[in-house]
Structures are given as structure tokens and as C-alpha cells.
Design a protein with these regions (language model features):
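Serine-dependent protease modules
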Residues: 1-174
Length: 174
């Protein structure tokens, strides 16, 4: 969402605009951390552990689809740990939701009914370009790792990696 922006302004729920700058961004993860030019302590969401999220849970997707203003839609978690299927620049594993997500929702919160952050909306699979019930969010655990690295002053996001890759076993290999 921030890309190469030089003039960053965040619009709060009450309509106030606050200027800020990018502390850390990563196009591959489709995430950015902003530092806002204010001394005010702003409300924030608690990050929910991704391993506690279950298929069928109710969620709310918050965003600014098509620039129409702040919008909230609802749905459920449709799938966990989806890989290789999200459109756009984001790569990794995702939560799948049927909450309507459209262009402009990227970077918005996906929250549970308790108000905890489950994920950050990132992309959709759609032939029409609009929502058809297949949306994806970056899990809160990855968001938390990104925030931790931003607070530590990292200049780029270092992704978790196990250093191995799985593959199906063929008859010849066995």
C-alpha cells in the first residue's frame, strides 16, 4: 500500500489525519510499519496467536475498498496456511476468508469477534477484480514478527525459514 510514497497520511476513525513515515516495509510480505507524527497514545489491537485460529470462526474485514471510506464486512475463516495462491506481490502462507475484500482493503485488519487481530488483509482471487468470497490475510504471527524486527531497527524483513523443502516420495526413492 505504501510503495514508494513520500507523503504518508493516516486517517483515523474520527476523521483526523496524521502524517507519518515508513519505518520498515517489505513488498514481498505486503507489510509496512509506519511511525506517526503524534505524541498521542493511539488505540491498538492485540495480536492473536495464529495457531488458535480455526476454520469457521467469525471475522470482520476492515478497509477502504475502492476509496469509498472506512468499511467493515463480515465472514468466516475458510482455510488456514494457504500457500501459492494469493494474487499480488505478497508471498508466504495466508488465512483464507470469505469476508468481502476488494481493492483498497489491503493493509486493513481482519479481526475476530473479540476485537483481536487475526490477520492483515492482503489479496483476493477473482476473475472479475472484485470480491467473490476468496480473500487472503497475512496471519497475525507474521505481523508480530514484522513489528518486532521494525522495533529492533532492522532495515529489511528477515523471514522465518527452516532450510528444508518437502517433496512427494516416489517408488524409486523408497
Amino acid at each position: 500500500v505504501v510503495g514508494c510514497a513520500t507523503d504518508i497520511r493516516v486517517v483515523l476513525h474520527d476523521g483526523r489525519e496524521i502524517s507519518g513515515n515508513v519505518i520498515l516495509s517489505d513488498e514481498e510480505s505486503d507489510l509496512a510499519v509506519l511511525k506517526l507524527d503524534t505524541d498521542e497514545i493511539l488505540p491498538h489491537l492485540e495480536l492473536r496467536k495464529s495457531d488458535t485460529v480455526e476454520v469457521g470462526e467469525l471475522v470482520l474485514a476492515i478497509g477502504n475498498p475502492f476509496g469509498v471510506g472506512q468499511t467493515v464486512t463480515n465472514g468466516i475463516i475458510s482455510g488456514l496456511a494457504r500457500t501459492g495462491i494469493a494474487s499480488g506481490s505478497a508471498k508466504g502462507y495466508f488465512l483464507q476468508t470469505d469476508a468481502p475484500i476488494n481493492p483498497g482493503n489491503s493493509g486493513g485488519a481482519l479481526i475476530d469477534i473479540s476485537g483481536s487481530l487475526v490477520g492483515v488483509n492482503t489479496s483476493i482471487l477473482s476473475r472479475s477484480g472484485g470480491s467473490n468470497g476468496i480473500g487472503f490475510a497475512i496471519p497475525a504471527d507474521l505481523v508480530g514478527q514484522f513489528l518486532t524486527q521494525a522495533k529492533a531497527g532492522y532495515s529489511g524483513f528477515i523471514r522465518p525459514w527452516a532450510g528444508m523443502r518437502g517433496q512427494p516420495i516416489t517408488f524409486e526413492m523408497a
